[in-house]
């Protein structure tokens, strides 16, 4: 018995394999975090002129960390150095996103921040020179809103960095 080769059969199998592969890739679901919708929130960060004074009272820049959190318990109980660590393992289960920025004394920085729709809190950590005397941690609870309210929201997140304190509010 002889094998008869059908012209184009190899090409046909290759096309079929590509088609199967594409259909399988198309059915793969992304992890929930990767698919989560983002909510844009107008944000304004203002730094006082006397921000983060040194021993001589001269103002200096400060690094601000902004955490999007699903829960706030671990964040509230963590020390400064645990939160400032880029891995922040102590809050890993609650942390949806971490943003780091440096602000200069007297700077006002408007931005449109994108927040994970599962975020319930924004945690702030300011790296002041004098961590012992500073109010380096701030927390703001995000409003729980439905889809339409998110779309038409006019809320604004205000973050204020005073000489040795960080505070936040939603207006």
Give the location of each predicted region:
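Bacterial N-terminal signal peptides that target proteins for export
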Residues: 3-18
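Bacterial N-terminal signal peptides
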Residues: 17-27
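Short amphipathic, basic-aromatic surface patches that mediate peripheral association
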Residues: 44-55
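Short coil-to-beta strand junction motifs in C2/discoidin
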Residues: 56-65
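Tryptophan-paired
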Residues: 78-115
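A short, solvent-exposed beta-strand micro-motif common in secreted/extracellular proteins
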Residues: 119-129
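Short acidic/polar inter-strand loop motif in beta-rich domains
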Residues: 129-136
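Glycine-rich, aromatic-bearing surface loops/beta-hairpins
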Residues: 137-171
